[in-house]
Protein backbone atom coordinates (compact mmCIF):
# COMPACT_ATOMS: atom_id res chain seq x y z
CA UNK A 1 0.00 0.00 0.00
CA UNK A 2 2.90 2.37 0.61
CA UNK A 3 3.22 4.59 -2.46
CA UNK A 4 6.46 4.32 -4.46
CA UNK A 5 5.91 7.02 -7.10
CA UNK A 6 3.79 10.14 -7.48
CA UNK A 7 2.21 11.53 -10.62
CA UNK A 8 0.47 14.71 -9.50
CA UNK A 9 -2.85 16.21 -10.59
CA UNK A 10 -4.90 19.13 -9.35
CA UNK A 11 -8.66 19.65 -9.33
CA UNK A 12 -10.05 22.65 -11.19
CA UNK A 13 -13.10 22.51 -8.95
CA UNK A 14 -13.41 21.32 -5.33
CA UNK A 15 -13.91 17.57 -4.92
CA UNK A 16 -16.87 17.09 -2.60
CA UNK A 17 -18.03 13.50 -3.14
CA UNK A 18 -18.44 11.52 0.09
CA UNK A 19 -17.04 8.03 0.58
CA UNK A 20 -20.38 6.23 0.20
CA UNK A 21 -21.25 8.03 -3.03
CA UNK A 22 -17.78 7.38 -4.41
CA UNK A 23 -18.04 3.68 -3.54
CA UNK A 24 -21.39 3.46 -5.33
CA UNK A 25 -20.05 5.19 -8.43
CA UNK A 26 -17.01 2.92 -8.70
CA UNK A 27 -19.08 -0.24 -8.16
CA UNK A 28 -20.43 -0.04 -11.72
CA UNK A 29 -16.87 -0.38 -13.04
CA UNK A 30 -15.53 -3.16 -10.83
CA UNK A 31 -12.71 -5.28 -12.20
CA UNK A 32 -13.50 -8.76 -13.48
CA UNK A 33 -10.95 -11.25 -14.84
CA UNK A 34 -10.41 -11.81 -18.56
CA UNK A 35 -12.70 -14.27 -20.27
CA UNK A 36 -11.42 -16.69 -22.88
CA UNK A 37 -11.75 -14.13 -25.69
CA UNK A 38 -10.80 -10.98 -23.79
CA UNK A 39 -7.52 -9.32 -24.69
CA UNK A 40 -7.59 -7.19 -21.52
CA UNK A 41 -9.87 -6.11 -18.67
CA UNK A 42 -9.66 -3.01 -16.50
CA UNK A 43 -11.65 -1.93 -13.47
CA UNK A 44 -11.69 -0.82 -9.85
CA UNK A 45 -10.65 -3.32 -7.18
CA UNK A 46 -10.38 -3.36 -3.39
CA UNK A 47 -8.42 -0.32 -2.28
CA UNK A 48 -6.51 -2.27 0.38
CA UNK A 49 -5.94 -5.36 -1.73
CA UNK A 50 -6.92 -8.90 -0.77
CA UNK A 51 -7.51 -7.98 2.86
CA UNK A 52 -9.86 -5.14 1.93
CA UNK A 53 -13.55 -5.31 1.13
CA UNK A 54 -14.32 -1.85 -0.30
CA UNK A 55 -13.37 -0.04 -3.49
CA UNK A 56 -12.73 3.13 -1.49
CA UNK A 57 -10.83 3.31 1.77
CA UNK A 58 -11.09 6.64 3.56
CA UNK A 59 -9.49 8.22 6.60
CA UNK A 60 -9.49 11.90 7.55
CA UNK A 61 -11.40 12.67 4.32
CA UNK A 62 -8.58 11.19 2.23
CA UNK A 63 -9.68 8.52 -0.21
CA UNK A 64 -7.62 5.60 -1.50
CA UNK A 65 -8.74 3.86 -4.70
CA UNK A 66 -7.20 1.13 -6.83
CA UNK A 67 -7.54 -0.14 -10.40
CA UNK A 68 -6.53 -3.58 -11.66
CA UNK A 69 -5.58 -4.33 -15.25
CA UNK A 70 -5.28 -7.82 -16.68
CA UNK A 71 -3.69 -8.31 -20.10
CA UNK A 72 -3.32 -11.47 -22.17
CA UNK A 73 0.27 -12.07 -23.28
CA UNK A 74 0.37 -12.78 -27.00
CA UNK A 75 3.98 -12.68 -28.26
CA UNK A 76 4.13 -10.73 -31.51
CA UNK A 77 6.62 -13.22 -32.95
CA UNK A 78 4.25 -16.14 -32.38
CA UNK A 79 1.43 -14.30 -34.17
CA UNK A 80 3.79 -13.30 -36.99
CA UNK A 81 5.07 -16.84 -37.55
CA UNK A 82 1.58 -18.36 -37.40
CA UNK A 83 0.30 -15.79 -39.88
CA UNK A 84 3.18 -16.33 -42.30
CA UNK A 85 2.63 -20.09 -42.17
CA UNK A 86 -1.11 -19.76 -42.79
CA UNK A 87 -0.67 -17.24 -45.62
CA UNK A 88 1.95 -19.41 -47.34
CA UNK A 89 -0.33 -22.45 -47.07
CA UNK A 90 -3.35 -20.70 -48.61
CA UNK A 91 -1.33 -18.97 -51.34
CA UNK A 92 0.23 -22.32 -52.28
CA UNK A 93 -3.11 -24.14 -52.32
CA UNK A 94 -4.94 -21.43 -54.28
CA UNK A 95 -1.97 -20.31 -56.38
CA UNK A 96 -2.55 -16.61 -55.71
CA UNK A 97 -1.39 -13.78 -53.48
CA UNK A 98 -3.61 -12.84 -50.57
CA UNK A 99 -4.76 -9.23 -50.27
CA UNK A 100 -3.99 -7.19 -47.17
CA UNK A 101 -7.63 -7.39 -46.07
CA UNK A 102 -7.48 -11.19 -46.18
CA UNK A 103 -4.23 -11.25 -44.20
CA UNK A 104 -5.75 -8.97 -41.57
CA UNK A 105 -8.74 -11.30 -41.25
CA UNK A 106 -6.41 -14.28 -40.84
CA UNK A 107 -4.46 -12.43 -38.17
CA UNK A 108 -7.67 -11.80 -36.23
CA UNK A 109 -8.54 -15.50 -36.48
CA UNK A 110 -5.11 -16.48 -35.17
CA UNK A 111 -5.39 -14.09 -32.22
CA UNK A 112 -8.87 -15.45 -31.44
CA UNK A 113 -7.54 -19.01 -31.45
CA UNK A 114 -4.57 -18.13 -29.22
CA UNK A 115 -6.43 -16.08 -26.61
CA UNK A 116 -7.95 -18.98 -24.61
CA UNK A 117 -4.47 -20.51 -24.16
CA UNK A 118 -2.58 -17.29 -23.49
CA UNK A 119 -1.05 -16.46 -20.14
CA UNK A 120 -2.12 -13.21 -18.53
CA UNK A 121 -0.50 -10.65 -16.27
CA UNK A 122 -2.07 -8.29 -13.79
CA UNK A 123 -0.98 -4.90 -12.54
CA UNK A 124 -2.48 -2.50 -10.04
CA UNK A 125 -2.36 1.27 -9.74
CA UNK A 126 -3.51 3.20 -6.69
CA UNK A 127 -4.44 6.82 -6.26
CA UNK A 128 -4.95 9.05 -3.25
CA UNK A 129 -7.66 11.69 -3.52
CA UNK A 130 -6.90 14.65 -1.25
CA UNK A 131 -9.86 17.08 -1.17
CA UNK A 132 -8.06 19.29 1.38
CA UNK A 133 -5.32 20.01 -1.18
CA UNK A 134 -7.59 19.65 -4.22
CA UNK A 135 -5.13 17.08 -5.55
CA UNK A 136 -4.97 13.49 -6.76
CA UNK A 137 -1.69 11.61 -6.26
CA UNK A 138 -1.32 8.57 -8.50
CA UNK A 139 1.14 5.89 -7.43
CA UNK A 140 2.71 5.33 -10.83
CA UNK A 141 5.90 6.25 -12.64
CA UNK A 142 3.97 6.05 -15.91
CA UNK A 143 1.86 9.00 -17.01
CA UNK A 144 -0.03 6.62 -19.31
CA UNK A 145 -1.10 4.39 -16.40
CA UNK A 146 -2.05 7.44 -14.36
CA UNK A 147 -4.21 8.75 -17.20
CA UNK A 148 -5.87 5.32 -17.57
CA UNK A 149 -6.88 5.42 -13.92
CA UNK A 150 -8.19 8.97 -14.21
CA UNK A 151 -10.10 8.12 -17.38
CA UNK A 152 -11.94 5.30 -15.62
CA UNK A 153 -12.60 7.49 -12.58
CA UNK A 154 -13.96 10.18 -14.90
CA UNK A 155 -16.22 7.62 -16.54
CA UNK A 156 -17.50 6.43 -13.16
CA UNK A 157 -18.18 9.94 -11.84
CA UNK A 158 -19.44 11.46 -15.08
CA UNK A 159 -16.81 14.21 -14.92
CA UNK A 160 -13.41 14.72 -13.33
CA UNK A 161 -12.01 18.26 -13.65
CA UNK A 162 -8.30 17.56 -13.09
CA UNK A 163 -5.13 18.70 -14.84
CA UNK A 164 -1.46 17.88 -14.32
CA UNK A 165 0.06 19.90 -11.49
CA UNK A 166 2.37 22.70 -12.61
CA UNK A 167 4.18 25.45 -10.78
CA UNK A 168 4.68 29.21 -11.21
CA UNK A 169 8.35 28.78 -12.09
CA UNK A 170 9.97 25.96 -14.11
CA UNK A 171 11.02 23.22 -11.73
CA UNK A 172 14.40 22.81 -13.44
CA UNK A 173 15.18 26.46 -12.68
CA UNK A 174 14.36 25.94 -9.01
CA UNK A 175 16.40 22.74 -8.75
CA UNK A 176 19.32 24.44 -10.47
CA UNK A 177 19.24 27.25 -7.92
CA UNK A 178 19.21 24.75 -5.09
CA UNK A 179 22.28 23.06 -6.51
CA UNK A 180 24.06 26.39 -7.00
CA UNK A 181 23.29 27.36 -3.41
CA UNK A 182 24.44 24.00 -2.10
CA UNK A 183 21.19 23.25 -0.29
CA UNK A 184 17.46 22.76 -0.75
CA UNK A 185 14.82 24.69 1.21
CA UNK A 186 13.98 23.08 4.55
CA UNK A 187 12.65 20.54 5.33
CA UNK A 188 14.26 19.11 2.18
CA UNK A 189 17.88 18.00 2.07
CA UNK A 190 19.84 17.32 -1.11
CA UNK A 191 21.33 13.86 -1.48
CA UNK A 192 24.02 12.49 -3.80
CA UNK A 193 22.21 12.08 -7.11
CA UNK A 194 21.26 14.47 -9.91
CA UNK A 195 20.70 14.63 -13.65
CA UNK A 196 21.69 17.77 -15.56
CA UNK A 197 20.62 18.64 -19.10
CA UNK A 198 21.70 21.33 -21.48
CA UNK A 199 19.02 23.89 -22.27
CA UNK A 200 19.86 23.48 -25.97
CA UNK A 201 18.07 20.64 -27.75
CA UNK A 202 21.34 19.21 -29.04
CA UNK A 203 23.05 19.51 -25.67
CA UNK A 204 24.20 16.64 -23.52
CA UNK A 205 22.97 14.95 -20.35
CA UNK A 206 25.17 14.38 -17.31
CA UNK A 207 24.20 12.05 -14.47
CA UNK A 208 25.78 12.01 -11.03
CA UNK A 209 25.21 9.23 -8.51
CA UNK A 210 26.79 8.68 -5.11
CA UNK A 211 28.71 11.92 -5.52
CA UNK A 212 28.93 15.10 -3.48
CA UNK A 213 26.86 17.54 -5.53
CA UNK A 214 28.72 20.50 -4.03
CA UNK A 215 31.97 19.54 -5.77
CA UNK A 216 33.42 21.82 -8.46
CA UNK A 217 33.11 19.05 -11.05
CA UNK A 218 29.34 19.14 -10.66
CA UNK A 219 28.95 22.91 -10.41
CA UNK A 220 31.09 23.43 -13.51
CA UNK A 221 28.29 21.98 -15.62
CA UNK A 222 25.95 24.71 -14.40
CA UNK A 223 28.39 27.29 -15.75
CA UNK A 224 28.01 25.78 -19.23
CA UNK A 225 24.24 26.28 -19.14
CA UNK A 226 23.05 22.91 -17.95
CA UNK A 227 20.02 22.74 -15.66
CA UNK A 228 19.00 20.21 -13.04
CA UNK A 229 16.13 18.01 -14.20
CA UNK A 230 16.31 15.31 -11.52
CA UNK A 231 17.42 15.70 -7.93
CA UNK A 232 17.47 13.19 -5.07
CA UNK A 233 16.09 14.62 -1.84
CA UNK A 234 15.17 13.66 1.69
CA UNK A 235 11.98 15.07 3.20
CA UNK A 236 12.79 15.37 6.88
CA UNK A 237 13.50 11.96 8.35
CA UNK A 238 10.53 10.24 6.74
CA UNK A 239 10.82 10.12 2.94
CA UNK A 240 13.52 9.71 0.29
CA UNK A 241 12.56 10.73 -3.24
CA UNK A 242 13.73 11.73 -6.70
CA UNK A 243 12.09 14.98 -7.82
CA UNK A 244 11.84 15.49 -11.59
CA UNK A 245 11.34 18.59 -13.71
CA UNK A 246 7.94 17.36 -14.95
CA UNK A 247 6.67 17.58 -11.34
CA UNK A 248 6.63 13.81 -10.92
CA UNK A 249 8.22 12.06 -7.97
CA UNK A 250 10.04 8.78 -8.51
CA UNK A 251 11.58 6.27 -6.10
CA UNK A 252 9.46 7.46 -3.20
CA UNK A 253 10.54 5.52 -0.12
CA UNK A 254 9.29 5.88 3.43
CA UNK A 255 12.01 5.27 6.01
CA UNK A 256 11.89 2.17 8.18
CA UNK A 257 11.73 4.37 11.27
CA UNK A 258 8.70 6.21 9.92
CA UNK A 259 6.91 3.03 8.83
CA UNK A 260 7.49 1.60 12.29
CA UNK A 261 5.23 4.31 13.73
CA UNK A 262 2.36 1.83 14.05
CA UNK A 263 4.39 -1.17 15.21
CA UNK A 264 2.73 -1.08 18.62
CA UNK A 265 -0.47 -2.25 16.90
CA UNK A 266 1.19 -5.51 15.91
CA UNK A 267 -0.20 -7.65 13.07
CA UNK A 268 -2.94 -9.54 14.90
CA UNK A 269 -5.59 -7.43 13.18
CA UNK A 270 -4.33 -6.90 9.59
CA UNK A 271 -7.14 -4.51 8.67
CA UNK A 272 -6.53 -2.30 11.70
CA UNK A 273 -2.84 -2.15 10.81
CA UNK A 274 -3.57 -1.32 7.16
CA UNK A 275 -5.98 1.40 8.23
CA UNK A 276 -3.42 2.90 10.60
CA UNK A 277 -0.66 2.71 7.99
CA UNK A 278 -2.90 4.41 5.43
CA UNK A 279 -3.65 7.24 7.85
CA UNK A 280 0.07 7.58 8.60
CA UNK A 281 1.02 7.61 4.92
CA UNK A 282 -1.77 10.01 3.98
CA UNK A 283 -0.79 12.55 6.62
CA UNK A 284 2.86 12.49 5.56
CA UNK A 285 2.04 12.81 1.86
CA UNK A 286 -0.11 15.85 2.65
CA UNK A 287 2.83 17.34 4.56
CA UNK A 288 5.14 16.52 1.64
CA UNK A 289 2.81 18.26 -0.83
CA UNK A 290 2.58 21.38 1.33
CA UNK A 291 6.38 21.52 1.60
CA UNK A 292 6.92 20.83 -2.10
CA UNK A 293 4.51 23.55 -3.23
CA UNK A 294 6.17 26.03 -0.88
CA UNK A 295 9.73 25.08 -1.90
CA UNK A 296 8.92 25.33 -5.61
CA UNK A 297 7.35 28.77 -5.33
CA UNK A 298 3.67 27.92 -5.50
CA UNK A 299 1.23 26.35 -7.92
CA UNK A 300 0.61 28.05 -11.25
CA UNK A 301 -2.18 30.57 -10.64
CA UNK A 302 -4.13 29.65 -13.77
CA UNK A 303 -4.95 26.35 -12.02
CA UNK A 304 -6.44 27.97 -8.94
From Swiss-Prot:
GO molecular function: double-stranded DNA binding
Chief localization: cytoplasm
InterPro entries: RdgC
GO biological process: DNA recombination; regulation of DNA recombination
Pfam family, any one: RdgC
Subcellular localization, as worded in the UniProt entry: Cytoplasm, Nucleoid
PANTHER family, alphabetized: RECOMBINATION-ASSOCIATED PROTEIN RDGC
Function in brief: May be involved in recombination.
Protein name: Recombination-associated protein RdgC
Gene: rdgC
Amino acid sequence: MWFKNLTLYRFNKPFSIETEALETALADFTFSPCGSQDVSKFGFSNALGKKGSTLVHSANNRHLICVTKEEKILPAQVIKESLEEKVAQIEDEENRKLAKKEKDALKDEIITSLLPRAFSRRSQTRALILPELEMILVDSSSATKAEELLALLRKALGSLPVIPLSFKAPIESQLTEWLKNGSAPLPFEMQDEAELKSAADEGGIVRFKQQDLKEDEVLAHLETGKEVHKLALHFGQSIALLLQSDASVKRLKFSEEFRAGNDELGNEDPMARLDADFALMGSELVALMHALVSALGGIEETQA
